[in-house]
């Protein structure tokens, strides 16, 4: 991937969301009536081996939305208008993805509209800093990032050797379902290649 390809995708997706968020937040504060900001971030959690620029941009939109939600909350807590910021992470078949094999469930683009309308309506006004997936008839909420396990250095500062000794038996690693699925599919392809010989 060239630097130009990287920059183009980041500019369209991440900078595009930033530009909308910045102007929308300023208008909502000025008119004192509040409102809702909605980011679209399909691909943020299903990292792509072929398009790291797209995955990075979409992951950046998640962080940008969380930052906008925190800013909106601080405005509201200081007596300003109620503004919220959320993301939709849809998985739907489009013309761009029709020929791409999906390992996961997919829906249709029109399945996403009711959730978007809800989040942008007065009924969704109390929903803030959330990431929702919409796939067909299923709607899911993603967890908020937080520390889940901690370890402490027995001395003043960590050494690489202490980390190597302690990490596997204390905080360990979190399983990654997408890498697990990739490994499974690669084994299936390899088995299929061998059976075809």
Regions found by a protein language model. Name each.
Residues 23-33, 75, 122:
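A short helix-coil junction within the Rossmann-fold of NAD(P)-dependent oxidoreductases
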């Amino acid at each position: 991937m060239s630097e130009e390809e990287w920059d183009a995708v980041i500019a369209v997706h991440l900078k595009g969301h930033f530009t909308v968020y910045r102007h929308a937040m300023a208008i909502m504060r000025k008119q004192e009536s509040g409102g809702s900001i909605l980011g679209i971030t399909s691909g943020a959690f299903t990292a792509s081996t072929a398009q790291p620029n797209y995955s990075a941009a979409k992951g950046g939109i998640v962080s940008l939305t969380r930052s906008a939600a925190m800013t909106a909350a601080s405005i509201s807590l200081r007596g300003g208008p109620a503004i919220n910021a959320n993301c939709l992470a849809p998985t739907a078949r489009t013309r761009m993805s029709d020929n791409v094999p999906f390992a996961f469930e997919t829906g249709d683009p029109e399945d996403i509209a009711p959730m978007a309308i809800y989040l942008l309506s007065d009924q969704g006004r109390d929903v803030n800093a959330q990431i929702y997936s919409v796939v067909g008839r299923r709607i899911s909420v993603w967890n908020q990032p937080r520390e889940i396990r901690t370890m402490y250095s027995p001395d003043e500062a960590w050494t690489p050797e202490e980390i190597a000794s302690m990490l596997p038996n204390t905080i360990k690693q979190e399983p990654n379902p997408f890498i697990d699925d990739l490994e499974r599919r690669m084994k299936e392809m390899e088995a299929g290649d061998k059976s075809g010989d």
